[in-house]
Amino acid sequence: MKTAFVFPGQGSQKVGMLQDLYNAYPIVKQRFEEADEALGYSITKLCFEGPDTELVKTANTQPAILTASVACYEVLKEQGFTPDIVGGHSLGEYSALVAAGVLDFKDAVYVVHKRGEYMQEAVPLGKGAMAAILALPREQVVEICQQVNDTVGSVQAVNFNCPG
């Protein structure tokens, strides 16, 4: 049997994430310390203490998710789990590249932080948003967006990641 690890994109972050693993596994603490060093600020403190209003900013979310993902991968590796293949959804592709040995962890932290900054500049806070719509057919999502467009303003159905 083959084993695959798939790393998540942004959106799964929350204040307090991985604090238990940080306290239990030295490799998790090491990864967070390396991320802090690469960023020049404490993503560790932001992940564990917040505030959420700062953690959700994409320039912070992206290195936080990458750090958490790679730290979890390292714990699994220490426990004897080795994937035959790795992949990632959106931002998770960077975690997969680190797990595959293609990209250095600290370089990846820096790159996704810059990626997040540029994304935030492109769409400043309060100027737009994305929402995950679950369990609706594509056609219904498009129809609802069109109804909103007719009454409120510009809403587009994009990034269809899976059926329903």
Language-model region placement:
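Basic, gly/Ser/Thr/Pro-rich low-complexity segments located predominantly at protein N termini
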Residues: 14-16, 21, 45, 93, ...
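Short amphipathic alpha-helical segments at helix-loop
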Residues: 53-57, 96, 100, 125
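Short, glycine/charge-rich beta-strand/loop segments that flank catalytic centers
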Residues: 53, 87-91, 128-132
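Gly/Ala-rich beta-loop-alpha elbow adjacent to hydrolase catalytic centers
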Residues: 69, 84, 88, 92, ...
